[in-house]
């Protein structure tokens, strides 16, 4: 309601004031203005009653405008107001204050109907006559007037004086020098010989309801009103400028919807704007756009009329509060002023500037901007760097826009020129040849048609065509129109021929253009996975930690990673091993030993479970991870070579991946081919006896890519891992929560663990995106309109064969394996990721390069000469035998002996409690083994426990050990044990000990510090045996004894009074003897 009143007061208070002034000026006898309070009261009452029917209010204000502009006379005004407000008799009665004293509304209720009467200067009119209004069309358009003048000129060609008289009469009527009746008499007499023209002239006269001339005061014919002939539903039609005759209302539309469209047509006076609004509604009806887009776009059409906008929201079942949230989310975060300017936040508007004076602050704009503040106005906007796919899409849109712009401009020019041609065709033949046009051809836009003609006729001949159109339009227009139509059809034909190519380019580049990280991440990742970069990063982090955190530099790790998902950890190892087996089968024994024996020691894994899992790679994809790994009492060892042959058989087919096989692969393949022939009989016999090994035939050795693709499945994990069972105490190599592993290594191992961690993190992030895949897939719902138009792109058909696993993570894992085998190319792999993950999985694009780098580091580790000695030291350090305090130091010294002088020593620590893996760079000159803070605390705890127990300390000689006891206080006839026992017994009987003293040891300075407010107390046992009264008497005696001593002490002090001594005594003695 408040909003409606505000609109009424702000937008239409001027019109109400003008209405009051007009009524008072014409009909008030004294010419005095009405009180302003009456106007405000009427506006408030009008707003309160018409807040839910805005179209009634619009009709009322239009009639007031018509009265003010002298379009209707006063009786017409009263009649229309009575029809508009026929449902509001109280408003009609209140309106009497604006009428002259001789006019007044008289209402007499009779049921639902009422009778309207007027009191006039000649008396009241009690019997109203029937008033049936005939409403002609509004004045004809400009072109019809020109055609009428041309026909009159041709009719009066033989008598030019009559034509001049007609022109003079029209000029006098325009200047209010003659009345309408005089003009009508003159024209009728001049066109007496041409009755058809005289009758046509009457169509141009203001004879409709809004164009009746106002008679003199006091001579108005008073007419009654028949409400059945003139109802409120016709008001909107009377107020519109034109109404097509071929419009017919739909029978299924409600009254509210019908009134809404009529009011929209009245508000959107421009026909093209009204058609654009109907097109927007049509898009919503067809399901191309949703309700939010409809409301946000429709606000631009109807925001000027608040009542109509509320009706539109009610039709869409959307509240104003919901619209604000939709519109604010669709628009900018800042308030807008037009399509280009945004209001800056307060902190941006209040920037200090010392170079301005008062005048500059008054005229310069600091609130609204349309240019970024971080860019220079001279240099223009800084365009964001685009990827090649974005460049292709931009170029495609520019080509489409160019064709659309030319076709639209040509169509508009043809339409405009045809209107001029039709107007010229209505002229006589003699006038057509001499008819000329002004510059610009009288079109609303001069630039559009000029650019179109320059585009068709080139710039050299365009000026000649402009002059010809202005001087000889009758001859030039047909030629230009035909040429433009020919060119327009040519451009449309070319556009249709280019549509398939444009659609193909769009299909190839659209998804990639949305993935902005695609290209740049590949370039960065190639640098980030290099050994040089990883080693330099470790050195930089170590120096920064030492500079900013000097106290933590000895114990903190440069890198710390968390491996809390064992399934992803297993999958990471499986992927690296698969790449090595597939592409580099040489040295598999060392690789298998490294993964099955060395890697579990670094990550706290169970060797048996991890070894069974990796047997799927080293023994074949058909290996059962839950089956026992033995045949009888001996393990099956011959199957590994056969499974390797199956996995590396893909190398025999270089046509699949388009690459040449390496020398090592070729050598291994020849060796296996020669060995398979001699071993086939033994293999067959072994498989028959055990039943666990499948014989390998020539067909299996030469299987095609389709068979390899079918054999690639997601690796099956052991049941104990999938079910998360607790196998406490089942295996020898089980890791406890308080057992951590510390190993030492060199640069190749450090680089491998860094690459291994990157691979683990990307697979782990891929697993976490499992929930978002379904959300992304819901957005790929086909639009029925696009399917009907055959422009819908089914991206599923463009993908290669998608694996059929349980989850999307497993499907993606199998796709990575196919990429490693070369079955799927890089482009198809990226399209698969974009289809399921959108732009979230861009880190997986280079996973094959990352796996290759990790496999390369594994080969560097196992092919190094010191690998055998380092692995033996690692296994010896990880043994379950008890270690001494200096074993870690000796282990480190042995590792340093194997390294070159310029090589870096690394320490790898696995903290099983937090599932974290730390890497630290060690100094070669540092002879003290650096330990983490948790390790130091654990060692200190162990030291305190050893200190308290009664046993000999290791590596300490007791040859020269002397006891610090005083021999004179020890009874000679007793031993030390007897003396200690006697003293303890006597102490327990005579005193009560309460131990509360606490101490701590600083790890950095090794200082023993006692905690404040902690102490040991001894209580004599005799006090504990006393009764309460005896205890109080004893305490009072002691208190009195202290008092006497205190008084004597105070008297000996010079300058101290007794009063002061008494006060201090009471304060201190009571504190000393509080029980």
From Swiss-Prot:
Function comment: Has a role in chromatin assembly and chromosome segregation. Involved in the deacetylation of histones.
Cited SUPFAM superfamilies: PAH2 domain
Residues modified to Phosphoserine: 641, 643
Matches recorded under PROSITE patterns: PAH (PS51477)
Annotated disulfide bonds: none
GO molecular function per UniProt: molecular adaptor activity; transcription corepressor activity
Protein name: Paired amphipathic helix protein pst2
Residue stretches of biased makeup (Low complexity): 676-691
Organism: Schizosaccharomyces pombe (strain 972 / ATCC 24843) (Fission yeast)
Pfam families associated with the record: PAH, Sin3_corepress, Sin3a_C
GO CC, alphabetical: chromatin; nucleus; Rpd3S complex; Sin3-type complex
Predominant location category: nucleus
Biased segments, Basic and acidic residues type: 658-675
């Amino acid at each position: 309601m408040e909003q409606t009143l505000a609109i009424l007061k702000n937008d239409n208070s001027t019109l109400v004031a003008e209405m009051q002034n007009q009524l008072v000026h014409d009909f008030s006898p004294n010419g005095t203005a009405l009180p302003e309070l009456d106007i405000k009261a009427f506006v408030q009452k009008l707003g309160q009653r018409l807040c839910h029917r805005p179209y009634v209010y619009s009709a009322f204000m239009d009639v007031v405008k018509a009265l003010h502009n002298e379009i209707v006379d006063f009786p017409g005004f009263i009649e229309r107001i009575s029809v508009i407000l026929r449902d509001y008799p109280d408003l009609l009665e209140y309106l009497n204050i604006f009428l002259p004293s001789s006019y007044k509304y008289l209402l007499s209720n009779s049921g639902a109907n009422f009778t309207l009467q007027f009191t006039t200067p000649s008396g009241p009119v009690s019997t109203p006559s029937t008033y049936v209004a005939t409403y002609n069309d509004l004045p004809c358009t400009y072109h019809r007037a020109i055609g009428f003048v041309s026909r009159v000129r041709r009719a009066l060609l033989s008598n030019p004086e009559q034509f001049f008289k007609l022109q003079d009469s029209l000029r006098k009527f325009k200047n209010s020098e003659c009345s309408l009746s005089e003009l009508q008499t003159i024209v009728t007499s001049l066109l007496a010989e041409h009755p058809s023209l005289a009758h046509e002239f009457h169509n141009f006269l203001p004879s409709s309801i809004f164009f009746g001339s106002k008679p003199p005061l006091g001579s108005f014919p008073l007419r009654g009103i028949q409400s059945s002939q003139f109802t409120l539903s016709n008001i909107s039609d009377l107020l519109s400028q034109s109404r097509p005759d071929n419009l017919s209302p739909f029978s299924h539309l409600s009254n509210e919807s019908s009134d809404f469209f009529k009011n929209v047509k009245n508000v959107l006076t421009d026909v093209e704007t009204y058609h654009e609004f109907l097109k927007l509604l049509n898009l919503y009806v067809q399901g191309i756009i949703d309700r939010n887009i409809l409301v946000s776009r429709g606000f631009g059409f109807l925001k000027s009329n608040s009542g109509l906008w509320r009706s539109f929201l009610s039709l869409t079942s959307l509240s104003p509060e919901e619209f604000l949230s939709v519109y604010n989310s669709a628009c900018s975060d800042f308030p807008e002023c037009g399509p280009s300017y945004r209001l800056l936040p307060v902190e941006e508007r209040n920037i200090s500037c010392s170079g301005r004076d008062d005048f500059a602050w008054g005229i310069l704009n600091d609130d609204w901007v349309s240019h970024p503040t971080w860019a220079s106005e001279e240099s223009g906007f800084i365009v964001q760097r685009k990827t090649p796919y974005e460049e292709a899409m931009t170029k495609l849109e520019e080509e489409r826009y160019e064709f659309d712009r030319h076709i639209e401009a040509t169509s508009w020019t043809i339409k405009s020129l045809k209107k001029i041609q039709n107007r010229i065709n209505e002229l006589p033949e003699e006038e057509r040849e001499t008819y000329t046009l002004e510059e610009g051809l009288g079109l609303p836009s001069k630039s559009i048609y000029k650019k179109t003609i320059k585009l068709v006729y080139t710039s050299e001949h365009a000026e000649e065509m402009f002059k010809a159109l202005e001087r000889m339009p009758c001859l030039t227009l047909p030629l230009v129109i035909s040429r433009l139509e020919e060119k327009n059809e040519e451009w449309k034909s070319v556009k249709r021929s280019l549509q398939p190519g444009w659609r193909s380019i769009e299909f190839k580049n659209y998804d990639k253009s949305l993935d902005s990280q695609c290209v740049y991440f590949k370039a960065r990742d190639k640098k980030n996975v290099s050994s040089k970069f990883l080693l330099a990063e470790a050195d930089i982090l170590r120096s920064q930690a030492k500079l900013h955190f000097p106290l933590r530099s000895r114990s903190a790790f440069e890198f710390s990673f968390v491996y809390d998902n064992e399934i992803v950890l297993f999958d990471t190892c499986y992927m690296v091993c698969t790449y090595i087996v597939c592409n580099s089968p040489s040295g598999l024994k060392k690789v298998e030993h490294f993964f099955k024996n060395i890697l579990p020691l670094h990550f706290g894994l169970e060797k048996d479970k991890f070894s069974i899992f990796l047997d799927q790679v080293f023994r074949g994809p058909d290996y059962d991870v839950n089956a026992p790994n033995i045949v009888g009492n001996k393990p099956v060892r011959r199957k590994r070579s056969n499974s390797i042959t199956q996995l590396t058989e893909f190398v025999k087919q270089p046509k699949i991946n388009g690459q040449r096989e390496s020398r090592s692969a070729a050598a291994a393949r020849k060796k296996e081919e020669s060995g398979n022939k001699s071993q086939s009989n033994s293999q067959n016999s072994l498989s028959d006896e055990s039943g666990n090994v499948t014989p390998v035939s020539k067909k299996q050795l030469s299987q095609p890519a389709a068979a390899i693709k079918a054999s690639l499945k997601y690796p099956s994990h052991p049941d104990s891992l999938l079910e998360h069972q607790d196998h406490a105490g089942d295996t020898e190599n089980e890791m406890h929560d308080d057992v951590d592993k510390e190993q030492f290594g060199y640069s190749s191992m450090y680089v491998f663990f860094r690459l291994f961690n990157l691979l683990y993190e990307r697979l782990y992030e891929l697993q976490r995106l499992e929930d978002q895949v379904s959300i992304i897939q819901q957005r790929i719902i086909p639009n029925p309109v696009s399917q009907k138009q055959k422009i819908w792109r089914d991206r599923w058909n463009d993908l290669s064969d998608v694996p059929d696993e349980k989850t999307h993570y497993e499907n993606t894992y199998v796709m990575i394996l196919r990429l490693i085998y070369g079955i799927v190319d890089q482009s198809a792999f990226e399209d698969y990721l974009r289809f399921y993950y959108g732009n979230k999985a861009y880190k997986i694009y280079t996973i094959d390069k990352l796996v290759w780098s990790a496999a390369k580091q594994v080969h560097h580790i196992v092919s190094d000469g010191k690998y055998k000695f380092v692995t033996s030291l690692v296994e010896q350090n990880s043994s379950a035998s008890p270690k001494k305090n200096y074993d870690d130091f000796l282990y480190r010294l042995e590792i340093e002996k194997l390294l070159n002088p310029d090589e870096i020593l690394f320490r790898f620590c696995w903290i099983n409690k937090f599932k974290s893996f730390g890497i630290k760079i060690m100094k070669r000159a540092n002879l003290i083994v650096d330990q983490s803070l948790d390790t130091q605390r654990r060692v200190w705890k162990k030291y305190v426990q050893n200190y308290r127990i009664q046993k000999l300390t290791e590596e300490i000689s007791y040859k020269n050990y002397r006891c610090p006891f005083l021999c004179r206080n020890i009874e000679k006839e007793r031993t030390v044990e007897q003396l200690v026992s006697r003293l303890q017994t006597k102490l327990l009987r005579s005193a009560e000990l309460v131990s509360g003293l606490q101490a701590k040891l600083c790890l950095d300075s090794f200082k023993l510090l006692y905690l404040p407010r902690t102490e040991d107390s001894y209580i004599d046992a005799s006090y504990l045996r006393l009764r309460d009264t005896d205890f109080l008497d004893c305490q009072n005696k002691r208190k009195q004894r202290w008092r006497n001593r205190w008084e004597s002490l105070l008297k000996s002090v010079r300058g101290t009074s007794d009063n002061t001594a008494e006060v201090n005594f009471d304060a201190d003695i009571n504190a000393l003897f509080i029980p």
